[in-house]
Amino acid sequence: MNVIYFSGSGNTRHCAELFAGATSGKAVSIESGQEALQTITGAAEVGLAYPTHYSDVPLIVKNFIAQNGALFKGKKVFVIVTMGLFSGDGAGVGARLLKKQGAKILGGLHLRMPDSIGDVPMLKKPMAQNLAAIKQTEQKIARAVDSTKNGLYPKDGLSFWHFLAGLFGQRLWFIPTVKALRSKLKIDAQKCSGCGVCASGCPTKSIAIQKGKAVFTPGSCTLCYRCVNHCPARAITLIGKRVLEQCRYDIYEKTMKEAR
C-alpha cells in the first residue's frame, strides 16, 4: 500500500516508510506536490500518515485534505497516526475529514514515538526510553502489516470512546492554545546565524531570511517543530524558552546504529 504522509521530525516518515515498504508500496510526502497527488489518484487504496497535535490533525494536513478532497472520493484510506504520550482519536479526526470527502476508512493505527517537542522539560525522556518506544512501534507496525494482509485492519482511534477521550482529554481545552501558538514561534536573533535551514525546511513558508536573520511570519505555522529541531544554533523555540533536546528520528536512528 502506498502511503502519503506529513512529518516534522522524521518520526512519521519512518513509520510511513516501514508500513509502505512491508506492503509493497512507497511512502510519499504531501510536500512533494504532484507526486503525492498522483499517488492518491493511481491507487484504489492509500495510507495517510501524520503526527497528532493535541489530539488533532496538523493544519497542513487538514488543508491538504480539503484542497484535494475530490481525489479522495471513493478511495479506501488507512489512517496512520504517530503520537507522543496520548492521541485519543487522532486517527478518528482525520478519518472524519476524509469521510466528508467521500473516502471509505479501512482502519486506523496509532503509533507511539519519541515526543517532538524539545523545549518543554516534562516531555523529555532518556534516550533509552525513546529507543525502546521506537522498537515497540516497529513491532506494532509489523503486526499491523500481517493483519492487513489478511484483510483485518486495526481500528485505533475510530470508536466513540476514542472520540470522547480525544475531545475532552485534549482537543476541547487546547483550541485557544493551538490558535495562539501559530503566532508564538520565537527566534533568538543573537543566536541565529542566518544559515537558512529553518526557512528552507518550513512546510508553510512561515520563515524567511531577511538581512541575515531568520524572521517568522505568524498565522499559518503548523506546529511541526521542524525548525526547532533542525536549527544548528538552537535559536528557535515555540512552547518553551530553551531547546533542551533536538528531537529528530535521524538522531535516534544514528544512536541505534552506533549501539549495534
Residue ranges and their predicted role:
Residues 234-260:
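Long, positively charged, glycine-interspersed low-complexity recognition regions
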Residues 156, 160, 179-190, 199-200:
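Reductase modules of NAD(P)H-dependent flavoproteins
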Residues 15, 224-227, 247:
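Generic recognition of cysteine residues
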Residues 111-115, 196-209, 254-260:
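Short, highly charged low-complexity linear segments
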Residues 187, 193, 197-215, 219, ...:
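Iron-sulfur cluster-binding cysteine motifs and their immediate structural context
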Residues 1-3, 7-14, 20-32, 41-50, ...:
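FMN-binding flavodoxin-like domain, especially the glycine-rich phosphate-binding loop
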